[in-house]
């Protein structure tokens, strides 16, 4: 079955959703050889993954993972990684601001991919216990209004592809599946992608997956976040409808910066950056976090404008509510 699928892909034929799900199920159940997995991933990459193929793979990952079942809508803010720019942890720091503003956040993440410090690495040096069971994560989400979902804890089937992915050393469909496979089935998502050509296709996949509202973003400087150093392309998902547009920092009264001002470092260095921002330090890093947070608040709160959400995000920092949310989260991660 996998051999037939590889044959079709090599001949530049697209797979149906059902056929792709069959192949993905076989891989995620450990029923494919390393050679078959490598051939499937490489040929798919060379052909170019379709919206249907990405949708099918994301569906299987969602089915196979350990799940959270919150009684309320949650938001995720996450990037694909792979932009190779080594920026600081914009989405992770934003999550404390968003949660402090009353939006439940189920942050899905892992250790470093494209930088020296992934979301898990930063949270760990901040003092968060990241190795929690799904039951503990669900309890913390209910108690604190946010949780961290460690990818390796929730997606155990990924062990069947880990060795092949590492040996291949190229981007594959799995680089974009992580943000699409939140174990809490986030209804609201801000997803950053490393390639502008992925913006609208990923938005279409989110429609297929039933997400209520989402923003898929790509900075023209290459960033898989909303950037302050250039224009950002956005495709908005709003209950099945798509709307693509561009934003610039100047539209929101923010000063454009150089990309070098957004570069991060080691986990310890990024810890210092995070605490400086949450303690009120001004500058490009703060403004970038504020803008990404504001877009998430805008998605969740239908009755607010983006500029109002920008002021709310700024207030979450200046009032120390975001810093207090971090402290609350750290404490809960060790007590639950």
UniProtKB/Swiss-Prot annotation:
NCBIfam families in the cross-refs: trpD
Pathway assigned to this chain's UniProt record: Amino-acid biosynthesis; L-tryptophan biosynthesis; L-tryptophan from chorismate: step 2/5
UniProt subunit comment: Homodimer.
Reaction(s) catalysed by this chain's protein: N-(5-phospho-beta-D-ribosyl)anthranilate + diphosphate = 5-phospho-alpha-D-ribose 1-diphosphate + anthranilate
Alphabetized Gene3D superfamilies for the sequence: Nucleoside phosphorylase/phosphoribosyltransferase catalytic domain, Transferase, Pyrimidine Nucleoside Phosphorylase, Chain C
Name of the protein in its database record: Anthranilate phosphoribosyltransferase
Keyword Metal-binding on entry: yes
């Amino acid at each position: 079955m996998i051999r037939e699928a590889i044959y079709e892909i090599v001949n530049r034929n697209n797979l149906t959703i059902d056929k792709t799900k069959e192949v993905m199920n076989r891989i995620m159940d450990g029923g494919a050889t390393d050679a078959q997995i490598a051939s499937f991933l490489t040929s798919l990459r060379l052909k170019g993954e379709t919206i249907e193929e990405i949708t099918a793979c994301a569906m299987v990952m969602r089915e196979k993972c350990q799940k959270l079942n919150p009684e309320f809508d949650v938001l995720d803010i996450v990037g694909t990684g792979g932009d190779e720019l080594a920026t600081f942890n914009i989405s992770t720091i934003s999550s404390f601001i968003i949660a402090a503003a009353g939006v439940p956040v189920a942050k899905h993440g892992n250790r470093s991919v494209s930088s020296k410090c992934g979301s898990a690495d930063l949270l760990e040096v901040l003092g968060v216990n990241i190795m929690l069971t799904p039951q503990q994560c669900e309890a913390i989400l209910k108690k604190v209004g946010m949780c961290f979902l460690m990818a390796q804890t929730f997606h155990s089937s990924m062990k069947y592809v880990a060795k092949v992915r590492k040996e291949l050393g190229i981007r594959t469909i799995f680089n974009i599946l992580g943000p699409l496979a939140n174990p809490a089935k986030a209804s609201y998502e801000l997803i950053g992608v490393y390639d502008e050509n992925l913006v609208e296709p990923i938005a279409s996949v989110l429609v297929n997956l039933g997400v209520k509202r989402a923003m898929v973003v790509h900075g023209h400087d290459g960033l898989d976040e909303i950037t302050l150093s250039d224009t950002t392309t956005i495709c908005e998902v709003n209950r099945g409808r798509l709307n693509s547009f561009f934003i610039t920092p100047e539209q929101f009264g923010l000063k454009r910066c150089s990309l070098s001002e957004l570069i991060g470092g080691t986990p310890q260095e990024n810890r210092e950056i995070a605490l400086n921002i949450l303690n009120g330090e001004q500058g490009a890093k703060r403004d970038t976090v504020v803008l990404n947070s504001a877009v998430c608040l805008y998605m969740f709160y239908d009755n607010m404008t983006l500029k109002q959400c920008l002021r709310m995000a700024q207030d979450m920092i200046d009032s120390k509510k975001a810093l207090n949310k971090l402290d609350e989260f750290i404490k809960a991660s060790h007590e639950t």
